[in-house]
Structure formats: C-alpha cells, structure tokens
Amino acid sequence: MLRQVPRTLVAGGSALAVAVGVLVAPLATGAAAAPTYNYAEALQKSMFFYQAQRSGDLPADFPVSWRGDSGLTDGADVGKDLTGGWYDAGDHVKFGFPMAFSATMLAWGAIESPTGYSKAGSLDELKDNLRFVSDYFVKAHTAPNELYVQVGDGEADHKWWGPAEVMTMARPSHKISASCPGSDVAAETAAALASSAIVLKGDDPAYAATLVSHAKQLYTFADTYRGAYSDCVTAASAYYKSWSGYQDELVWGAYWLYKATGDATYLAKAEAEYDKLGTENQSTTRSYKWTIAWDNKQFGTYALLAMETGKQKYVDDANRWLDYWTVGVNGQKVPYSPGGQAVLDSWGALRYAANTSFVALVYSDWMTDATRKARYHDFGVRQINYALGDNPRSSSYVVGFGANPPTAPHHRTAHGSWLDSITTPAQSRHVLYGALVGGPGSPNDAYTDSRQDYVANEVATDYNAGFTSALARLVEEYGGTPLASFPTPEQPDGDQLFVEAMLNQPPSGTFTEVKAMIRNQSAFPARSLKNAKVRYWFTTDGFAASDVTLSANYSECGAQSGKGVSAGGTLGYVELSCVGQDIHPGGQSQHRREIQFRLTGPAGWNPANDPSYTGLTQTALAKASAITLYDGSTLVWGKEPTGTTTDTTPPTTPGTPVATGVTTVGASLSWAASTDAGSGVAGYELYRVQGTTQTLVGTTTAAAYILRDLTPGTAYSYVVKAKDVAGNVSAASAAVTFTTDTTGETEPPTTPGTPVASAVTSTGATLAWAPSTGDPAVSGYDVLRVQGTTTTVVAQTTVPTVTLSGLTPSTAYTYAVRAKNVAGDVSALSAPVTFTTAAPPVDTVAPTVPGTPVASNVATTGATLTWTASTDSGGSGLAGYEVLRVSGTTQTLVASPTTATVALAGLTPATAYSYVVRAKDGAGNVSAVSSPVTFTTLPVTSTPSCTVVYSTNSWNVGFTGSVKITNTGTTPLTWTLGFAFPSGQQVTQGWSATWSQTGTTVTATGLSWNATLQPGQSTDIGFNGSHPGTNTNPASFTVNGEVCG
C-alpha cells in the first residue's frame, strides 16, 4: 500500500541510467572472490518479483503460478487499451511516474552488467520484463502530446484488501496533455523507452526503433509544454507528487536519448539543463544530501555526465554526493546504524541505500582515483550485503531469499485474503520471491516482520530497481549460481472453491431441507465465480426423478425452483443456480453465497441413501464433497456419484518407471499408464523409496514426472501408485533406481555449421548456420566476434540464425558460433566466417530552408518561436535546427532544438530581439538561414497580482512545506516570495526556487524556468524544514514586497 505522504521530501534526484559507449575501468577486484551471498539467486528472484507485479493478460505458462489475468478493462473509461504495465506496490494502482523510473533503472543495470544477467540465467527474463512494461508505455502514449500516467484511484484502491485478479472498484484513467502538462513523467517515460531500446535493440531492431520514436516525441512534449504532472493529475499528488519539479527529468531524458540515438544535440541539451538543477539551501553547490529515487534523478546524472564527458564539475558533484554517503562532507554524513545500514529516510530506507549502491558500484568502475574507487565499491557491496543478511539480525530483507527472510510483505495479492482483511489468513498464502522490503526505518537495525507495517514491510517496483541492477553488477564481479528449478509452481493450500452444508431440520418422510454455502477462497490464482451451479444428488427409491421438486426459503442467488433430473439408473439431482452472481474472494459477503433449499418427494422418501445426504448434520456447516459445484459445466468441487454402486476397485498397477535425461540435479520418469473400469484414473502418486520407507514426493495426472533439486552423485529409487476418482489406490509399481551424475553431462552438443553471412549492409548483417544436435537437447547458441586470439560473446539465440546490428561501415568482421545444451555443456567453436560491411551512403544535400519564425508568448524575459519545418531528401534525415540571435552583422547560436519550436528564456525586459533559424541533417549539412523575426520583450510589471497557497506535512520536529504561486493579474509576473516563520522554524533544503533565510524571514526567487508567470499560470515550489515542536503557518506572504492573497 502506498502511503499518503510523499516518499521523497527533498529537492534532489532519483533516476539512474548508463550510457552505451562509456568506457569504464576494470572491476575493482582483479580476480573475482567467492561471493558472500548467492547474488545470482537473489537476482533471479528479483526478476520473479517484477513478473508478479504484472497487470493485464498473462500467458498460460506464466512463471508466477498464483497470478492470473487482471485489469483487463483498464482504459475502457476513455476508450483506450491501457492494459498491461506493473502494479506499483502491494496495491493495484498503475502509477506511471515510478513505473517509468523503475524501468529506466533496470535497463541501466542491463546495459552496465549484461554478463551478470547471463551468469544468473536471467537475461531473457530481464528483457521480457522491459519489453512488457515498454509495451504498456507505448499504449499509454496515445498521441504526440498525450500520455496516460495513472490508472486507478489510490484512495479507492487502498480501501480494499484483496487479490488483483478480482478487483471490482472503478479504475479511472488519467492523462497529461498540452493543456495539462507533465514534463517530469513525460521525460521519465522517454528515458525508460530510450534506455530499454538500447537493451532490446540487438534482439529486435525494429521494436527498438519504435521505442526511440516514442521517446523522442515524449521528450519534445516534456520540453515544449512544461509543468509538474501532479499539478494537473491531482489523483497522483497524495502518492507520487513531483516534489523536485521536472528539471532533473529534462536532464535525465535528454541523456538517455543521446545514448539511444547518438545524437549529440541531446547531450548538449542534457548539459544545458544540468546547470538549472537544485542546489543546497543558500548555496550554489549542487544538492548532495539526498539520493536517486523515483522523484529526483539529478544525483544519477552527476555520475552519468561525469563518466560521459569527464568534465570536472560533474565529477565534483558526483564525488561530493557519494562522499556524503560514505565518509561525510563538511562534517555531515548520512546516518548509519550500528550494524552498518545507511539510513536516509524512514520510508523505504533499504531502497535508498540500494539505489545509491548501484550508482556507487558503476561509478567506481570508471574512476581512476584509487581511494574513492575502493571507497564507493566497498560501500555498494556492504549495503547490498546488509539487505541480503549481513546485519545484526542475521536476516535477509528479501522475501524468499536467505536466512529468516520476511514472510509478511505488505502485498494484497501475495497475502491472498478472501475476506478483505489484512489479518486473515495469518500467514501469506504465496511467496513473493525477490521483493525487497522497506527494512529498518531508523538507524538502529530494528525491524518487525508485520504485514500491517506498510513502512517497514512495503514492497514496490522502485524498491527493487536499483537493488536489482546492483545485484547484476555483483554477479558480474563475484559470480553466483541460479537455482536450477526456479520457480516451482505453488500448490493450492487447500480447497479453493467448495460447498459447505448442514441440515436445517430433521428429515421427514417427504422432504429434505438443507442450508448450503458456496465459498470462493481461491488464490492459485484468485478467480471470480460468475456461473456457479450446485447439484444435490439423490436416489429415486422406485419413483421418477421428476417427482422431486426444488424450492428455497432463503437464497442469495435469487429464486430457486424446478424438478429433479434423472442421471441414469436410480440416480437424480436438483440444480441450484447462482449464474450471474460475482462470487469472488473479495470480502465477507463477496466470497460466499447462501441458499436454504428443500427437496420434496413422494411419501415414504428415505434420504439416508442419497449420495449428497451423506455426512450432513444439524449442528454446523461442514464441507460437503457429495454436493457438487460447477463453474458453468465444469466441475470445480466435489465428486459426482457414479450411480448407486460404490466404486471400491483400485486401478491397475502402473508400469515400472523408466528414468531418462538424468543430470546432476534431475531426471525424467515415465511409466505405462494404469486403467480403471469404475470411477476412472484420477492420477498418480510418486514415492521415493529409502529402505522400508516410502515418502510421497509429488502427484501428477500424466504417466510421467520430472524430478528436480536432486543431489549430484546420489542413488535414488522410486515407485508409482495410481489413484481413481473414488479414492482407491493401486499397489505400488516395481521400483526404478538410478544415480545422478557427478559432473553433469559429459557429451556436449555437436559443433554448429560454419556461419553464412547474408543481407550485409553498412551497419549490420544476418548470420545462419547448420544447427547442432545432442542429448540432452540443445538450448541455444553463443555468437562470438573473433579478433585475433580474443573472442567476445556478442549475441545469444535459441535458433540457428542471428541478426547483427550497430556495426561500423567498411569494416571486416569475423564471427564463430558455439552451441549449449540444457545441462550447461558447450560445444566446440564453429569454423569462422568473415565479411566486410558496406560503405556508408554519402549525403551532400542540405535540408530545405526553415520557414520564417513566428514569436508568441512574449513575456518580460522570454518568448516562444515556431516555424515551418524543413525537409531533407539527402538520405541522412533531418537532425534538428540551430536558432541564432541576429545583432547587426553578427549571428550567435542560442539553441539547438530537434523540433520546429524553441522556448527562449533569460531575455532582458523591454528589449528588441531578432532571430533566424537554419536546419541541419544527420550528415552535418546545414541549410541557409530563414528570414528573421523581430519582437520586443514586455516591460517588468511593478504591481503584481497573485495568490499564494501554503500547506505542510509535519512529523516529529520536521516538515515539508509546499507553496503554489499563481499570477492572477493580466500581465506577466516575475516573482520573489517572502514570508516570516512565527514559531522558530528553519528551512533546511528547498527546490524549484533559490531559498534563503535570515532570522525568521524567508525569501524564495524563481529559477530560469519558472521565474516569470504568465497570466493565470502557477508554479509549485517547496522545501524541507525543522520546527521546535510547533509548526504554525506564516501569517502572510508577499510577492515583490506586496502582500499576496
């Protein structure tokens, strides 16, 4: 459940990304040491967590066995398909802002540490998770300047505690647009799509190109129509308000687009916007006392731009931030617990430490400063190890991993309640493998595993994002072993759909009266029962089945009436219908339906021999397996009688099992099927034989079973028994005995055929080869580039062909291929293939001249220019524009937009300006300049007309202050805010303005992007502060010295 206060209450950043092409130094440790923890298993399980968070239509073979389809009507309220995406946390709202941040962080981790994912056997799962969420973002981007950023309502969602599959509350869709801007979420979604495109490009270049196209549009949207999304989408403001503003996302999004496209214009944009990022209070020093999380990404951009450009100002900002987390800055340092946990904030403390750890590890790889390199590396390893169990409690904070892990995460679907109750059942019904909980919220290492504690035990997609990427980095350095049979499908914890019944009164000679209760406690996965039917079976005792009539005194499923139906011989039944009722595990009344019904027959009717009468009492409701329950025509509970004769004959004995595919940890068993002439074979029970002891290891409905998690070099014996529908069990089969391998499969696959190159272009080619064979089966191929004596894996595929991309024109390439089988054995390398890429096409044609610019939104310090777009026929495509200021005979470059519009800022009031524009293509050809546009900025207004709205969120001796300034006048307003604290409060850090405090007087001045407000326009600014125990609001506020209403 998301709290109703912000998770991050500072100006600062939260979004990480790594650039393709950044050269990094070798890992901090020259030779990988044995890992303290099995990082590969933790990474593998973290991928499971993201799968468990999926919304929408899930495939039949989905690895999370207890999840089903959900949210299938998302977007229907606005006529759009908004199915898919991730549920945010333990609730079921799809918040686009943290979802996009989480995707970007995961993509960064894949770009930085693909080998870590490969070693953990999780690269396919990572790509699948990124593609799944990218598909959702593409759906949500319904027009160039339109993006749906939230589905569901937090307040309504949090009032209900049940599984996602059976939600019934309204799920409204919320969007941003040109008239309702959201630069923060639009730029973050652009970053998510651009970074994901980098990861997915090698597998599907066309799909990656689609993601980049959407990312470009979204970034232009974010840059052109500026504003914080939570100002317009107020449904998000109580949960994921953009406290830091959108400046950080403009840097972050531009950087990622640069890495995805190679277009240096985006890098220049990132650097230009960087200079407007938040600073420490009353200082020009970039903020460093917080960290990267869903709201603010500036801390991640410190490291990214440092690694990309090497410029000292970025290096200084990154070092200062990470020093604050490690050794301290100017005597101040993030708080540490006695056990070594870095605790920045009470809500999701482990999340903040994990995010910082990932950046620290990546940044340390790049550094040449030996002291800081070791410091940041060791900090990252230490914080991740703390979460995995290296803490005073010797306990993991990752569900389903390590020693004493959390068992009660604050997660509705994993809990599996059918009563809309956070406490029932007491134990969670599912294991939410891989979920990182919030952990200790104070620097004292204290923690209680309680589902009701939605601070310490909350889980969320953004909690796992940096943590997952850090795990991939540690697997790359230290290794690890993924679990061979993970995940294992969970088995139902009892009856999911059933009928309870009792007698309402003693039977008479003409009727039987029964109280029946249909219950839906399903969670494997949860499901709605909308076509429920119940059959009560009776014997005819010499009369016709139609002589029995059905009636009901009380029914929660509507009127019940009818006559008995013959089932053949002396068997009949009456059917009660709940068709049209939504019986689902969603509450006390929602999960059940009660019917009190009566069967009336001829005089002298004896109910004692009726199959459904067996076991009924007058004392209490009890499960009645002889009263059958159906979903439509499908039997979901109970056993249908087979006439008046009871089946007491067991099935025939199964054949002796045969073991095949024996590996170090598993084997496949199969046997000749049993037969049963009575109620029919229901399935088989497999037993391990150890001396005179037989231990049940599993059941199956097929005459085969796959054994997993065996011990290498160990002898095993098994027998099989058959069981029929009536419950009769056959004799055991003869035993099969085999010994698992000690070193795995000794026969690798055959060597693949020599690759053949085709479709060779200047930047790519297709390779195909004759497939390998072997037993066990071939699972895939590694494609390796050969450079002298060095070979490097550049692609992996499950089919004998691969498409290469991103090659250099006019360059010779050599590749070879090797095969792998399911046991991990690798074949010899194939013979190599060598080919040379084609020369690049030459573009010498300049774009057409742009149209004459048109000035609009002219203010005191800014204006907007638009012009008719250029076209380019030379082949390299239009890359962007250069906007030049004209002063006499001098032309000065002032902006390089990628679209036919630019917002000018920092102009002087009451001053004439002239500008021209020229276009530039991908080959560097430049058009002639356009005709000039001339305009004069407005003079500064001296009498502002405004309103100020002030609100706070307080805790202990701290608080967050939020201020909305609105220009209610008719002319532009360049503002300076002033007020006085009445209770000794102090501003400690602010954002979206330059803050200062002298005594009790506080002053805030606008930044370049929000300093001037047009008529009717608003800006949100804010700060963190301290108070002595009383936090009285200021009496009044001034703008430019005048009292503001």
Swiss-Prot record:
The linker region (also termed 'hinge') may be a potential site for proteolysis. This is Endoglucanase B. Residues 653-743, 751-840, 849-940 form the Fibronectin type-III domain. Its EC number is 3.2.1.4. Residues 1-33 form the signal peptide. It catalyses: Endohydrolysis of (1->4)-beta-D-glucosidic linkages in cellulose, lichenin and cereal beta-D-glucans. The gene is cenB. It comes from Cellulomonas fimi. GO terms for biological process: cellulose catabolic process. Disulfide bonds join C946-C1044.
